[in-house]
Amino acid sequence: MKILKYLTILIFSFVSFNQANAFLDKDNKGAQSTGREDLSFLEAKNSNFKKGRDALKQAIKYKNKKKFEKSSKRLDKAIKYFVSAYEETPENLELLNYLGLVYYMVGDTIMSEIYYNQALVIDPKNNLINQKLGELYFNTKRTSLAKEKLKILSNCNCEEYSVLKMIIDGK
């Protein structure tokens, strides 16, 4: 009877261990994992993403203080860091949003539009990115495209809709 008990425990342990390993790939990340779900590395002290975000914050502070040359230098640094981070994680929605914003701030609306559209490929219903792209379209005299973005936001009952509507209506 004891042998049967130990044999049952041994078989149960073996089956449980194999089922647990079935969910792990060769790197022990998880079979369904793409490795991108955990984006905590973006917040690491020396990550390009964090450096870019810090440079952008500094650029905005300098711009508000009317120190435009310093602001411009910080924006260039932010672009450099964000592009480096983009090479590491090209499908990060927050990063694509920052790239669109920074390029818009330096006046490169073509690159800004590219990154905003790339973000919308990942999340077509993202309210903030639809709003920002709508603003870009409006400011580049493409009102019909701006109104399309407004239409996408019309069902969200959100601040982004209100902001874009005020911009388009000129209020």
Predicted features along the sequence, with ranges:
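TPR/TPR-like (Sel1-like) alpha-helical repeat modules
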Residues: 121, 131-160
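Helix-start (N-cap) detector for alpha-helical repeat units in TPR-like alpha-solenoids
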Residues: 45, 93-94, 127-128, 160-162
